[in-house]
Amino acid sequence: KDVKDWDRIRPLDGTRGEYAVVLESQRILMEMLEEHVPFLQTLFSPATTLAKMCSPAVLVRHMREDPARVHRVLEMVTDTTIQFARASVDMGADGFFYASQLSGRQTMEKTEYEAFVEKYDLAILNAVKDRTWFNVLHLHGAQVRIDEVQHYPVQGLSWHDRDDGPSMEEVRKYSTKAFVGGLSWGENWLTKTEEQVVGEVREMCGRPGLILGPGCVIEPHTPKKFLELVHKTVVERSCCR
């Protein structure tokens, strides 16, 4: 994982290869829908993409060791991501679930975040904001910089509010954006009892500006009963609509 390894990265077409597979999956899914529901395609931030090629720690080390090399690759990934995003919108996407896995305060200094993460986030989000109507920024991890991203051109915010914080009450003090969350996510979700699942939903009921959902992903092997309980509780309480 030498910093010079980044020189091996070359530009990619955002509509070919694995991107083409995702776009075809989107096409098939949208054809299967019997009625129109808002469709958000997933995008990963360029810094997140680079971190997946090595690790967050290695990426930060390389940022500090040779920033010009890392910026060169971030620019390429940004261009590719914009190509993919525009193609997704052309196929009917209403917006994006834009995921950043390097938004934790413990990952890097604020000035580094602004130069290596925020700069490229804004380039992508600004490229699609006029062609979409609902975009969600997902900040993955603990101690996220949620107070520092309120200027991002997105309508919704998603983070591990229940599992890692900060709480929705705290963020609502300074944010007018819609919140997506309120439920535990991943393995944490699997440890819940049925009573705890119902309790999480009831706690969120009646809150303005909330789209009820997990703090991140739902495990594929989540018991169907849990999902049914969420729906049943929402309907019974006539909330979160």
Task: Indicate residue ranges for each PLM-predicted region.
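Active-site gating loops and adjacent loop-to-helix segments of metal-dependent hydrolytic enzymes
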Residues: 1-9
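Active-site loop segments of alpha/beta catalytic cores
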Residues: 13-241
